[in-house]
Structure formats: structure tokens, C-alpha cells
Amino acid sequence: MPNTDVSSLSMLGHQTETASSPEEAVLEKVPSNHAGTDYVVRFTAPEFTSLCPMTGQPDFAHIVIDYIPGEWLVESKSLKLFLHSFRNHGAFHEDCSIYIAKRIVELLDPKWLRIGAYWYPRGGIPIDVFWQTGKPPEGVWLPEQGVATYRGRG
């Protein structure tokens, strides 16, 4: 099994402050040791938090990010801190969701990526945001995201 050189990473293995905004947050990548193999990497953030840009009240989401790597993998600690940087950031649900996906695409240039952002109700209406870069490669096992549609007490 090949070793991955992590010497260029600034966060992994170090105490790291959370960035004050998503724009300031650093996302890092590591080389994929399986660049010629199509497989799915999934990150799930069941307690994602941001702020409503109008009221400043917290918004919560269950976010699922699936991607098929090319040459690079996202370093998970940097992703965790990037997602955490939204905690005090005011933005609409759609903006947060698409910004997260596009930052990862910009960093990695993956073969394929999708995001499912399942936002808890605001004003009595849950907002779910879905985006992907295109069709996934054929023959890849792509599990459902497994997040139930919001039902409330119904």
C-alpha cells in the first residue's frame, strides 16, 4: 500500500483555528493512490449550521457530499473546518449548498460530484438543495443518500 506524503498539509496533525468565514477557510487535498479506479467517496455532515442572512437565527442541515475522485482527495480535517466556518456566516440555503460543492470541485477537479443539502424547516418549509456536476461514470455503485424526506409529525 503506497504512503501518501502529507508534509504540505497545514492543518492535519496541527491545532487549527476555524476560519471566520467560508471565503477565508482553507480546503486542502491529498493525492489519490487509486486515481485510475472509479469509486465513490461520501462525506456526511448531519449537523451543519449556518445563519439566516435576514434574521441571524441559526439554520441547520444534513449535508451529503458524494464524489468520484480523479487525481486528488479532499483532506477531511480541512473539509470539517471549512464546513464549520459557516457556523457564523449568513447566507441562504441555496447559496451555502452550491458554494460548498463548487469549492470542492474547484479544489479537486473530481470526475463527478453531487451534493444533497437537506435543510430543516424555516418558516414551516424545509428546503432541500441538490446539485451535481453531470452524469456519473457508468458502472459505479452510487448508493442513495439515505436522508428521509422531512415529515414533521405527519
From Swiss-Prot:
Transmembrane segments: none
GO molecular function ontology, one term from the record: preQ1 synthase activity
The protein's enzyme class: oxidoreductase
UniProt-annotated catalytic positions: C52 (thioimide intermediate), D59 (proton donor)
Covalent S-S links between cysteines: none
Residue stretches of biased makeup (Polar residues): 1-21
Pathway noted in the entry: tRNA modification; tRNA-queuosine biosynthesis
Similarity section: Belongs to the GTP cyclohydrolase I family. QueF type 1 subfamily.
Entry EC number(s): 1.7.1.13
Catalytic activity of the protein: 7-aminomethyl-7-carbaguanine + 2 NADP(+) = 7-cyano-7-deazaguanine + 2 NADPH + 3 H(+)
Gene this protein is translated from: queF
The protein's role, per its UniProt record: Catalyzes the NADPH-dependent reduction of 7-cyano-7-deazaguanine (preQ0) to 7-aminomethyl-7-deazaguanine (preQ1).
Cellular-component GO terms for this entry: cytoplasm
GO BP annotation list: queuosine biosynthetic process; tRNA modification
Superkingdom classification of source: Bacteria
Pfam families: QueF
Cellular localisation: Cytoplasm
Matching InterPro entries: GTP-CH-I_C/QueF, NADPH_dep_7-cyano-7-deazaG_red, QueF, QueF_type1
Organism the protein comes from: Rhizobium etli (strain ATCC 51251 / DSM 11541 / JCM 21823 / NBRC 15573 / CFN 42)
PANTHER family membership: NADPH-DEPENDENT 7-CYANO-7-DEAZAGUANINE REDUCTASE (PTHR34354:SF1)
Name of this protein: NADPH-dependent 7-cyano-7-deazaguanine reductase
NCBIfam families found in the cross-reference section: QueF-II (TIGR03139)
